[in-house]
Design a protein with these regions (language model features):
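Acidic, low-complexity terminal tails and accessory targeting/binding regions
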Residues: 1, 84-93, 137, 141, ...
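Generic beta-sheet signal
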Residues: 2, 143-149
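Loop-to-helix element that buttresses phosphate recognition and phosphoryl-transfer chemistry
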Residues: 3, 9-64, 114-129
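Active-site metal-binding loops of divalent metal-dependent hydrolases
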Residues: 8, 151, 196-197
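Phosphate-coordination/substrate-recognition cap region in phosphate-metabolizing enzymes
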Residues: 35-103, 241-243
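Active-site signature of alpha/beta-hydrolase-fold catalytic machinery across serine-
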Residues: 63, 156, 160
Length: 243
């Protein structure tokens, strides 16, 4: 299972599109959010913690790592923010007047951000989803690992897991310091949580008997004899499998 965490608040969150601007750190609010999230997840065993290279994510990840001696930590640029090109560092109220803005909102699959370093939204989604798939393979089916990333990247990963076209990814929210969880299986991904800013870890822990939990999926049990995991977990209600 992958836990997708958006970084905590910064002084620029909201009014400015920070993008890859260096030196954007968590403010006091963001530090408090990161500490609160770390406390919520304290009893959840993590196989690894992986972060975007940007400071606001690394600081959030470091707060979660505090007290987790022996848990490996990594930085993966593929979980970095979208490369917004010439939009980087601009105020959102200014960008909202740009002719490209409504296209970003309604048709992001057709968007490439302006400037030599501007990235396409499909390209950003592809690198992020590929990174998740690579880490799934590297860490194994029963891993529970955390990725600290950015709003648009998290929304793009969740949209892919839900089978949504990228043009619908703006329907998904990823608030600062929120948690989204996806269990990947041989059959399909199961989106366990989205934009969770206050829930406990019930439902994220693997069941006590992981060996006998067919259908428990990545981070929660072994595959059954067919090699696939059929449900989203004990609380799921698949067709023909409960009400």
């Amino acid at each position: 299972m992958v836990l997708l965490v958006r970084h905590g608040l910064t002084a620029l969150t909201g009014p400015v599109l920070s993008g890859w601007t260096p030196g954007v750190h968590l403010d006091d609010r963001g530090q408090a959010q990161a500490a609160a999230l770390a406390a919520r997840l304290r009893d959840l065993p993590l196989t690894a913690v992986i972060s975007s290279p940007l400071e606001r994510c690394r600081e959030t990840a470091e707060a979660i790592m505090a007290g987790r001696d022996g848990t490996p930590s990594h930085v993966d640029e593929r979980f970095g923010e979208v490369h917004y090109g010439d939009w980087t560092g601009e105020k959102l109220e200014t960008l909202a007047k740009d002719p490209l803005w409504p296209v970003v909102q309604a048709h992001p699959s057709g968007v490439r951000f302006p400037g030599a370093e501007g990235e396409s939204m499909p390209g950003a989604q592809h690198r992020a989803v590929s990174a998740v798939r690579d880490w799934n393979a590297r860490l194994g089916d029963d891993a529970i690992y955390l990725v600290c990333s950015h709003g648009d990247i998290i929304k793009a990963i969740v949209a892919d897991a839900l089978g949504l076209h990228l043009d619908q990814f703006q329907r998904i929210q990823a608030a600062p310091a929120s948690l989204s969880a996806i269990r990947y299986t041989g059959l399909r991904p199961f989106v366990v949580r989205t934009n969770d800013v206050g829930g406990g870890i019930d439902g994220l822990l693997p069941p006590p008997d992981t060996e006998s939990a067919p259908g428990a999926g990545n981070g929660a049990g072994k595959a059954d004899e067919t090699g696939s995991r059929h449900t989203g977990g004990d609380g799921d209600a698949p067709v023909g499998g409960g009400a």
